[in-house]
Amino acid sequence: MAVASFCFLAMFKALNKFQYRPGDWKLLLLMSLAEPCLYFIFEAMALQHTSAAQAGMVTAILPPLAAALAFIFLKERVSGVAMLGFLIAFVGLVWLSLAAEKNAHASNPILGNALELAAMVCSAVYCVCLKKLSERYSPVPLTALQAFSGAVFFLPLALIQDAPEFTLGPSLAAILFLGIFVTLGAYLLYNIAIARMALSKATIFSNLIPVYTIIFAYWLLDESLTSNQLAACGLILSGVALGQSRRVKTPVANIAVIPD
């Protein structure tokens, strides 16, 4: 978060054009609290109890969950087929957790997957707030607000924790990668997509996370999934795919122009 914050300070010209509108502090606060603050707490706790591969599969619940919240708060229409897809994906999530086996990478997969689900709820709340705010603000200052609020929120927590042992070179490279390419780059692109597309269509791309997570967990962490877990993964993805079909189109509201 701190690395991304310093990068955003270099974009002072774009941030200087941020024009706060009275009353928006509630949405801005809720957006920042949901993600990155609570989201990353639940995410970090989840990965202490479940494997990266299983946590990645739980993220497949985000699109139908975001669609449900968009229906409630943004009045985006969701078909019965989409709701059926959400139910199927949730059943797959429960199956994935129950079929999980304890191992070196997943000491308590049921708890870990439940915490990951809580992280997805936070992410869905964040998406709804961002979509609403993008009608009035550019994605650049909204993403910068995420970075700044995350840095302020996590700094006291970092100071009270014991300093971890790390090798300077690889650890510094990992920190810079996360700060520049994830917190700044990935979030900025994701926020631009949410601002320019219907929320249900933008979040569908998060379905790629489980695929990449499983590939890299197998490649880098030597993790594996049982046949039951693989079947549950297929059920989750099937439910998510069904949830994206036949959704009634709604016009996307005008968004703020991204400053040069």
Show where each model-derived region lies.
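Cytoplasmic-side transmembrane-helix entry/capping segments in multi-pass membrane proteins
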Residues: 23-32, 78-90, 137-146
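C-terminal transmembrane-helix exit sites in multi-pass transporters
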Residues: 10-19, 43, 63-87, 211-231
